[in-house]
């Protein structure tokens, strides 16, 4: 039975790419449950709203320009272009979490204004808590425009060996990611183990309202000069970068929302896991997360305090991203890259292995874990295979 409802997914959150992907995945889940629905999404204008153009099933995307961290006294005026009347309004459950409300004053102001502005006929509810119905664990695929795919093809060399995209840092401070020297060790090991491999460097150096790569420009230049690097797409438009990643056999990076976007174009993601956040989004694409030995290299503090320690490269870094940790896991990174490039590991096994490792990293306490659509729960140790 269909309902033909109009639905607005109100997802005003932080700027990183991964949160735009998350919002679109929520919208997809609602639309796939009833294709007669007209589903739209509201996003922070500082996030990559253009990703919505890659979702032909989406009705509209509304970019709202309003502060996120700081108070937003004009939050109501910022909503003037958003239609008021909907059947359902579904919003990000984070708006109700005390730690989020204490940290992000602009988010609080946005949702207060949104509550006043929008007039849902059927109701307003947190995403993930029907009604309305939603389809669980749907694969999200971004349909990149032909112009972006053509531009990417022109930027990458024609060659016979496998290509690996490298994003050396997410959008946090540089201390949360490996140094350029540590990444050089990784590229040396990959080049030795996988003859003919070429690396495509991705990232964004521009400093504006959007997120950018948390590695100094000089270090990015140092990486770009590594013998394994055959091309870079630094600073090209996001959809062109994703089109370049789509032509690669995998994306290698630390934890980053860009990795979610890579999987949404069908590219496997190999993560040097650690830092504040573990990987929590799974999209029917093979992946590997190399989880650190947290007894030696503590990780996954989330909103908690995060100490730094001296790195072998002369600076300070979070423990799970120091050179010693990278060296300790080089063999695991190489093995994971090899199996992903060969297509040798199925998606379900990736989930089984990752959830097992993540539970172990949390001292066996699975209650500390979470994931989009709670996908991890079906892969907890003791439930494998049934």
Place the predicted regions along the sequence by residue.
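A structural signal for short coil/turn segments at secondary-structure junctions
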Residues: 34-35, 56, 159, 194, ...
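Active-site donor-nucleotide binding/catalytic segment of nucleotide-sugar enzymes
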Residues: 8-11, 92-108, 151-218, 275-277, ...
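Active-site and donor-binding regions of nucleotide-sugar-utilizing enzymes
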Residues: 2-119, 240-242, 259
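Leloir-type glycosyltransferase catalytic cores
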Residues: 120-155, 285-386
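Hydrophobic anchor at the start of a short beta-strand
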Residues: 36-40, 163, 197-199, 268-270, ...
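Generic beta-sheet signal
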Residues: 42, 64, 92, 202, ...
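Conserved nucleotide-diphosphate donor binding/catalytic pocket of glycan-assembly enzymes
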Residues: 58-150, 160-169, 173, 276-285, ...
């Amino acid at each position: 039975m269909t309902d033909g409802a109009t639905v607005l997914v109100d997802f005003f959150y932080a700027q990183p790419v991964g949160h735009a992907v998350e919002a679109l995945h929520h919208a997809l889940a609602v639309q796939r449950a009833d294709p007669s629905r007209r589903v739209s999404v509201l996003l922070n204008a500082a996030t990559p709203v253009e990703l919505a153009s890659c979702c032909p099933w989406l009705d509209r995307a509304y970019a709202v320009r309003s502060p996120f961290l700081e108070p937003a006294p004009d939050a109501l005026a910022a909503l003037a272009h958003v239609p008021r009347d909907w059947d359902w309004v579904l919003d990000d459950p984070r708006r109700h979490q005390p730690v989020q409300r204490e940290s992000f004053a602009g988010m609080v102001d946005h949702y207060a204004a949104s509550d006043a502005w929008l007039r849902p006929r059927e109701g307003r509810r947190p995403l993930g808590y029907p009604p309305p119905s939603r389809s669980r664990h749907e694969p999200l695929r971004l349909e990149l425009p032909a112009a972006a795919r053509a531009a990417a093809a022109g930027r990458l060399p024609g060659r016979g060996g496998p290509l690996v995209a490298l994003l050396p840092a997410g959008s946090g401070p540089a201390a949360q990611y490996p140094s350029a020297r540590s990444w050089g060790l990784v590229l040396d090991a990959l080049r030795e183990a996988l003859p003919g491999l070429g690396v495509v460097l991705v990232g964004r150096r521009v400093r504006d309202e959007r997120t950018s790569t948390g590695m100094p420009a000089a270090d990015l230049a140092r990486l770009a000069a590594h013998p394994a690097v055959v091309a870079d797409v630094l600073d090209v438009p996001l959809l062109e970068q994703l089109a370049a990643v789509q032509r690669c056999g995998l994306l290698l990076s630390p934890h980053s929302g860009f990795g979610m976007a890579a999987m949404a174009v069908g590219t496997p993601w190999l993560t040097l896991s650690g830092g504040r956040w573990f990987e929590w989004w799974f999209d029917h694409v093979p992946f590997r997360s190399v989880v650190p030995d947290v007894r030696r290299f503590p990780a996954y503090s989330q909103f908690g305090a995060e100490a730094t320690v001296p790195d072998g490269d002369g600076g300070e870094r979070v423990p799970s991203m120091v050179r010693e940790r990278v060296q300790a896991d080089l063999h695991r990174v190489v093995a994971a890259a090899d199996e992903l490039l060969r297509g040798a590991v199925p998606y379900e096994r990736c989930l089984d292995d990752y959830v097992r490792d993540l539970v172990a990293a949390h001292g066996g306490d699975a209650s500390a874990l979470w994931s989009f659509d709670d996908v991890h729960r079906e892969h907890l140790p003791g439930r494998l295979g049934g």
